[in-house]
Amino acid sequence: KGRYFKEFLEFYRILDGYIGQLKELLADDTTMIIASDHGFTELKYEFHANEWLRRAGWIDYRKNGKNGLENVSSESMGYSLIPGRFYINLEDRELDGNVKLEDYENVREELREMLLGIEGPEGGKVMKSVEVNEDIFEGDQMEIAPDLVALPNDGFDLKAGFGEKKDVFGKGPRNGMHTFENASLIIDRPGVSIEGSNLYNITPTILTLMNIKYDPSVFDGESLI
């Protein structure tokens, strides 16, 4: 339990009361939806992805005094942006790309295997999974999608940032962080099942409740009603 455990419980108790008051003000035929876009978990370590890449020989920096993406040298094989996005320094795509297209698949798979093998300071894998872009993205903007997306195990926060760091693993002021799982969804309408639902379902559901016509093909999710 954290230092302010009791204070947070009291905060949520008061917030719950306000939600109850709002519910009482709604007409009987009005549906209330309460949703969060993430869950929570304990934070043990921050993982500085670009520092890990630097120590693995995958990223190098220009000696220009800058501390951003423009500081990544043409000798680099890849870099990371938050949250857990990894880009291969691909020729003719990146500003100073040097990985040839014919080598792309092998380089990407090598990085993926390296990421999956990372262990934390206390043992245990840092990454829950590392996905290739074509398995999770589609559409007209694929050219700007990351080449790999890393999902951490609970307790690890994937950081980016450029420039040399003292350590690959660090600790910040927080002891909690967001997760992609365990988000909350409440729909107080009889007959609605939220089992297996996700964020993609929220907008179509709201549009259906408001009797607004829409083209289902433009959404990845479906209405829950």
Task: Please place each PLM-identified region on the residue numbering.
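Glycine- and acidic
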Residues: 1-8, 187-192
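Secreted, luminal/periplasmic, and some membrane-associated catalytic domains
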Residues: 2, 6, 20-161
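A short beta-strand-to-alpha-helix junction
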Residues: 10-13, 44, 60-82, 97-109, ...
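Hydrophobic alpha-helix feature that most strongly marks membrane-spanning transmembrane helices
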Residues: 27, 116, 120, 168-171, ...
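Short, low-complexity, polar/charged sequence segments that are solvent-exposed and flexible
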Residues: 52-55, 105-108, 167-172, 202-206
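Low-complexity, glycine/alanine/valine/leucine- and proline-rich hydrophobic stretches
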Residues: 151-203, 211
